[in-house]
Amino acid sequence: MNRFFATVFALTVCACAYADRILLEAEAFECKGGWKTDQQFMDIMYSPYLIAHGMGNPVENAYTSFNVGETGMYDVYVRTYNWTSPWHSGKGPGAFAVGVDGKRIGVTGNTGDSWAWQHVGKAKLKSGNHKFFLKDLTGFDGRCDAVYITSHKDDVPQEKCDAGWREKLNPRRTTEGKFDFVVVGGGIAGMCAAVTAARLGLRVALVNDRPVWGGNNSSEVRVHLGGNIEMGANKGLGRLIREFGPEKGGNAQPSSFYEDSKKEYFLKAEKNITLYPGFRAVGVVMNGEKIASVSAVNIESGDKLMLSAPLFAHCTGDATVVVLAGADWCMGREGKDEFHERYAPDVPDFMTMGASVQWYSVEGKEKFPEFKYGMNFNDSNCEQVLMGEWTWETGMNRNQITQAEQIRDYGMLTVYSNWSWLKNHSDKKAKYSDRKLGWVAYVAGKRESRRLMGDYILKEDDILKNVYHEDASFSTTWSIDLHFPDSLNHVNFPGREFKSATNHRLLKQPYDVPYRCLYSRNVNNLFMAGRNISVTHVALGTTRVMRTTGMQGEVVGMAASLCKKHSVLPRGVYRSYLPELKALMQKGIGKQNVPDNQNYNYTIEPEKR
């Protein structure tokens, strides 16, 4: 098993011309205590950050060491964000203290209305080593991007705070790698693409921006697998998922349900895969209409990768990097006139399915603080429940990429505000007196953002009329399942809905989706698998569930092996080697005699196998 072991270390001393200008990246702190690394919004703010996600209980301190070159008085700035400011004009709940060598300098995180550098105080520091700490005061998701310590008067750090400025202060090392196939995104689709290609002889790099594998099916998000496997024209597809798929179904369940270690073992067993967990893809280098290499950054150390290959697959969902490559894409809902879809709106718009912040409570007597930061609950509009799963969905009328942090934050705001009402004010609060929050997601479970355009765009008629295509590949079996704001929630919170509903349009039989939906129409060496494949918004309602995206990944891995074998690009497989691809899909790549453990959460009765 080839592995890249990123040496995660904190470069806490500014490596620039002035030893008295020091940038401490929070995600690189030597000890994070109870703070979590949050990389979800790097495309917008250029950096991960630490978040104190304690569900109302302060988390353990984070700290790191740094060196001062000259004794003197230093100003201390913290880049932070008062996360409830879009809904509440006063101080927010995310307060935390900062200090040096055990002495508090100031409190921050609960004022302002955007990510910004806040001056928290001064500290007299002697030359030599010191220890900087973050002390959470509330447990309500205070966040710290970076700390800037300077002895220069009026040396306020750059507000833009982009990667170039950070790199100048803290240079990072770059590691290069050459592969046959680079897969970006370690969810179910990316895992299946990487393993399939590796078993067919390709040297594969698999890049994932979280430390755990499985994407929405990991213990960080906790969405169960959905859809049927081993059905349709190519019954060999899907058996691979038996090898790593959790045996239990259910959303928002205890972490053990999602079997993170099983997924990791599944990947580590493949000698042809080099794993890069904790690396976020941030850029591309192009060679004409092909990707030459992808760059990625470690979400803790800041170390960089440059991975080159003749073939790439993007399986991240948002597809930000390949948009930088110029790949054609769309987002939102097509109007009826474009594809004559019955379930499309009359005119196109930017509405998407939302992102879920799931949660549950457990037994335990614990007080919960008053949480009033812009959500006004009462007994007529609150949710009198002990848990919230996929229906706790936000952001359907917001941009799922540029407004992703606010969408996630609004999800957390509603959970905390509702729970505070139930615990402290509800007429039925006695029912909740022996309950406490057991888990609230801070990694949002996205359903939809960008969709990349391939040589074919799957639409509603293809599915409902069972239109045959010669390049039929993976089968989609889930209903056309399109989410929209819940009608009662809309009445109670117009324009600020946090609950969703759906109408399932059941499929009568599996539908075999064209292979041409799995590669880009204008970036010639780019495959895609996952919720970002070439489909309309309506068609995405069926193709987006995770067993189905896993089979998409299998097809991509098989096609990549044929690209290498015949020295062609993805389109060349369709034009010249379709029979060979069909043979691979019918045979499958999954191991034989693996127990059939995936008999939950499907909408078509499984075939006996």
Label for each model-derived stretch:
Residues 171-175, 189, 216, 278, ...:
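Flavin (FAD/FMN)-binding glycine-rich loop and adjacent Rossmann-like elements that form
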Residues 187-188, 212:
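Residue-level detector of alpha-helix initiation sites
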Residues 10-18:
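Hydrophobic h-region of N-terminal signal peptides that target proteins for export
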Residues 2-10:
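Sec-dependent signal peptide recognition
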Residues 175-187:
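Beta1/beta-strand and adjacent pyrophosphate-binding region of the FAD-binding site
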Residues 196, 202-203, 208-290, 330, ...:
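Conserved N-terminal/central alpha/beta ligand/cofactor-binding core
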Residues 20-173:
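Extracytoplasmic
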